[in-house]
Amino acid sequence: MKILYAIQGTGNGHLSRAIEIVPYLQQRGEVDVLISGKQWELKTPFPVKYRLHGMGFIFGKKGGVDILKTYLNLNSLKLSREIRSLPIEEYDLIISDFEPVSAWACQIKNKPCIGLSNQVATLHPLAPKPTSTDTIGKLILKKYAPTTSNYGFHFKRFDKNVYTPIIRKQVREMKITNDGHITVYLPSMDDTKILKHLKNFDKYTFQIFSKHIRSSYRQGNFSVFPLSNDAFVKSMASSN
């Protein structure tokens, strides 16, 4: 069986999940991996056959997605070419982790596509909802990477097709200690913004990991480090 596993390349969450899932799929068939977007830092322990521009979101530095940069990064002609040229007819099973090229290629060519992401869980009728409705955000979740069947991930399992988050083996096998610090990682917010929000918590020690810096520094009760998978996991395992 030939399997296409398509990953959203905005941030490291989707790729982190794939690191655990792909080896299991490889036991069931021949797996090709696709990644679209460019805002991910984790190393892939498996070959990536398709590296596409896609329709990725661009993180800002003030929290959330930078709408302007995301719009400027959008290349609709290239996206259309990628969708139409992706040879999904060669695959028996297509899985999309909120990845738009594979999902829309399946839509156009009338192929089943399985959604496997935390995003599909948020659309479930039983999913916890915010007090105010974000109509545009909800529309994006529905239309960005449409799939024919869905399996979601959420902190609470409220349906048979919704599962608790997948935690990487590297994290699960870490020795847990308590060095007294609080570990912080907010990829869509730069370190200066985080420091501003946490400055009044002077009784606590923080280890902050930021993708927006190249060298570490210390400021009062804050230690700030450039993003490193191993260092972050170690910090998290030894946090308070």
Protein language model regions, located:
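Short, polar loop motifs at secondary-structure junctions
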Residues: 35-41, 97-101, 150-158, 208-216
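Donor-nucleotide binding loops and adjacent catalytic segments primarily
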Residues: 167-171, 175-238
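Conserved nucleotide-sugar phosphate-binding/catalytic loop shared by glycosyltransferases and other
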Residues: 5-9, 31-78
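A donor-sugar binding/catalytic signature common to diverse glycosyltransferases
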Residues: 93-101, 105, 115-116, 231-240
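Active-site-proximal region of nucleotide-activated glycan assembly enzymes
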Residues: 112-163
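A short, glycine/small-residue-rich beta-strand->loop->alpha-helix junction that serves as a flexible
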Residues: 6-19
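Structural motif
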Residues: 2, 92-93, 181, 240
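Conserved nucleotide-sugar donor-binding subdomain of glycosyltransferases
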Residues: 64-93, 100-101
